[in-house]
Amino acid sequence: MKIWSSEHVFGHPWDTVIQAAMRKYPNPMNPSVLGVDVLQRRVDGRGRLHSLRLLSTEWGLPSLVRAILGTSRTLTYIREHSVVDPVEKKMELCSTNITLTNLVSVNERLVYTPHPENPEMTVLTQEAIITVKGISLGSYLESLMANTISSNAKKGWAAIEWIIEHSESAVS
């Protein structure tokens, strides 16, 4: 098992970042996300928005990794559940792969909150737990996947900035 974590600060208020995060896919920074389907969306009694989405992704696994895993499949599906609490100003998003679960599990958690010292900024904390199952080079593959997650996180931050920039230019 490998744990990866990160923190990023956006120079935008929470509301702006959340609106962009909800519209993050598709984006030109991370073309590996091929599609997003909303399976369920509801507002609970406390006014929190719950969303359940299915993401179709193309894991660009190197041929060596595919050989070690014993699969040629690179199209994967991810289940994503998010809760947006506009009163507490908190968005929590949890995702897990639902494809190749016999070989690997990736559980990711993202939390967006206003910066504690500057409400014009937003803090994103991310954590991913990666587990490769029953493979002799499992820890090596977990480290490779953690590096990929780190790279994709940076693309995600850039995508949110891109969406905000393009949303603001569309309004002006």
UniProtKB/Swiss-Prot annotation:
Residues 1-172 form the PRELI/MSF1 domain. Disulfide bonds: none annotated. GO terms for cellular component: mitochondrial intermembrane space; mitochondrion. GO terms for molecular function: phosphatidic acid transfer activity. Pfam families: PRELI (PF04707). It comes from the Eukaryota. The record marks V36, L49 as: Important for interaction with TRIAP1. It is found in: Mitochondrion. PROSITE patterns: PRELI_MSF1 (PS50904). Keywords: Lipid transport, Mitochondrion, Transport. One of its GO terms (biological process) is phospholipid transport. In vitro, the TRIAP1:PRELID3A complex mediates the transfer of phosphatidic acid (PA) between liposomes and probably functions as a PA transporter across the mitochondrion intermembrane space. Phosphatidic acid import is required for cardiolipin (CL) synthesis in the mitochondrial inner membrane. Interacts with TRIAP1. Belongs to the slowmo family. PANTHER family: MSF1/PX19 RELATED. This is PRELI domain containing protein 3A. It comes from Homo sapiens. The lineage of its organism: Eukaryota, Metazoa, Chordata, Craniata, Vertebrata.
